[in-house]
């Protein structure tokens, strides 16, 4: 069995996931966290209209899940292992991103604290903030086409990042080539 399911909203499933991984493979070298969620209807309009329920659920799935996954993964991670997550533009208020911008800001802060906490175990913690990428998740953001075009026009390389660019960066960050790179 090469795949396991895990609902990151349920702590017991996160704990069980890493028990299952440990029983299958023993130790692990890395984890890539690529999890995010928000109610699509709350991404457009004003952030001010974010509901408490969506805020809490979005924060749990998009941010806290990385902390919980890191905690459990670090118990079975080899020395010089790597924890990696994906983020996007948390320093500016992006139209039609709303609560996800807040979640990504919290996620990026979490990366720093996890890097500090796990550095003594020689576990690296990093995040890739690649910019807007054409994915199914990104299609939920209103005006995504405008965002891609604006980014392409204003990037130094005059092009958008694609999934292959992100994959190459991820390979570097989870490999020993980045042995001294954390946060």
Feature names for model-found ranges:
Residues 36-71, 75, 79-120, 132-134:
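Catalytic loop of short-chain dehydrogenase/reductase
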Residues 124-134, 174-177:
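Conserved SDR Rossmann-fold cofactor-binding beta-strand/turn motif
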Residues 26, 76, 159-183:
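C-terminal substrate-recognition "lid" of short-chain dehydrogenase/reductases
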Residues 27, 82, 124-126, 179:
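Structural signature of beta-strand start/N-cap positions in the alpha/beta core
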Residues 119, 124, 181-183:
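Short, small/polar-rich loop/turn modules that mediate ligand/substrate recognition or access, typified
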Residues 2-6, 10-15, 19-26, 33-56, ...:
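Conserved mid-core segment of classical short-chain dehydrogenase/reductases
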């Amino acid at each position: 069995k090469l795949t396991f399911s895990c609902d990151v909203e349920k702590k017991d499933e996160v704990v069980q996931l890493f028990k299952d991984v440990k029983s299958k493979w023993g130790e692990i070298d890395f984890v890539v966290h690529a999890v995010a969620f928000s109610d699509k209807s709350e991404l457009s309009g004003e952030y001010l209209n974010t509901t408490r329920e969506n805020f809490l659920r979005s924060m749990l799935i998009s941010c806290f899940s990385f902390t919980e996954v890191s905690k459990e993964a670090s118990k079975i991670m080899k020395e010089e292992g790597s924890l990696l997550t994906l983020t996007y533009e948390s320093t500016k208020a992006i139209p039609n991103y709303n609560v996800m911008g807040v979640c990504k800001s919290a996620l990026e802060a979490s990366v720093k604290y996890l890097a500090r906490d796990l550095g003594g175990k020689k576990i690296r913690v990093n995040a890739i903030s690649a910019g807007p990428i054409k994915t199914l998740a990104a299609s939920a953001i209103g005006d995504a086409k405008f965002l891609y075009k604006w980014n392409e026009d204003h990037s130094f390389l005059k092009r958008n990042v694609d999934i292959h660019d992100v994959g190459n960066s991820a390979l570097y960050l989870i490999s020993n080539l980045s042995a001294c790179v954390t946060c």
